[in-house]
Design a protein with these regions (language model features):
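Short helix-loop capping/hinge motifs at secondary-structure junctions, enriched
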Residues: 1-3, 85-91
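Ligand-binding pocket segment of bilobal, Venus flytrap-like solute-binding proteins
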Residues: 1-66
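An extracytoplasmic/periplasmic, membrane-proximal ligand-sensing/linker region
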Residues: 115-158
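Solvent-exposed, polar/charged alpha-helical surfaces in well-ordered, non-transmembrane soluble domains
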Residues: 9, 24, 28, 32, ...
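A bilobed periplasmic-binding-protein/Venus flytrap-type ligand-binding module shared by bacterial periplasmic
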Residues: 75-87, 106
Length: 158
């Protein structure tokens, strides 16, 4: 935890602005020169680059470059069927559809999030190049979440 505490303190001390309410204003701040770097979910930049957020944001997004840490953390979107489901068969069919080539391709194109591996990707995403995904399980991240939040609070993260 000592190295983690040092990293958190360094992040807090290096903030050019208070923590932003979401990733879009943070990306705008980088594009406008208020910040030199930001850690953001990539799909926010994808929406801006595709013009989903309007022409002003599309223009601003052209001033931002994606750099992948090595390795990079990857958020996942998941689904499941609980024992309490009143219609587990339909719920299972929905999950199967959502993981199909058709749904994943549409989701990537509409939202600029990475689809399941091997399914057609959005041109915006392809332009950013490959990345090396961190080999940490979602289960392990969940196990460490409370400790991480405690370390953040104890070291000035707000």
């Amino acid at each position: 935890p000592a190295a983690t505490e040092d990293w958190i303190k360094g992040m807090v001390n290096n903030l050019a602005e208070p923590v932003f309410s979401s990733d879009t204003p943070m990306i705008r701040a980088v594009a406008q020169g208020q910040c030199g770097v930001a850690l953001a979910n990539s799909y926010y930049l994808g929406r801006m680059q595709a013009g989903d957020k309007g022409e002003a944001d599309k223009t601003l997004s052209g001033k931002v470059t994606v750099r992948w840490p090595d390795p990079v953390h990857v958020n996942i979107t998941g689904g499941g069927v609980t024992r309490a489901s009143r219609n587990p068969e339909a719920a299972q069919r929905l999950l199967e559809f959502l993981s199909s080539d058709q749904a994943q391709g549409g989701y990537a194109a509409a939202n600029h999030e990475y689809p399941l591996k091997g399914i057609g990707e959005d041109p915006v995403l392809q332009a950013w190049g490959p990345f090396n995904q961190a080999k940490v399980s979602a289960e392990r991240l969940g196990e460490l979440n409370a400790q991480a939040l405690e370390l953040m609070a104890a070291n000035g993260w707000q």
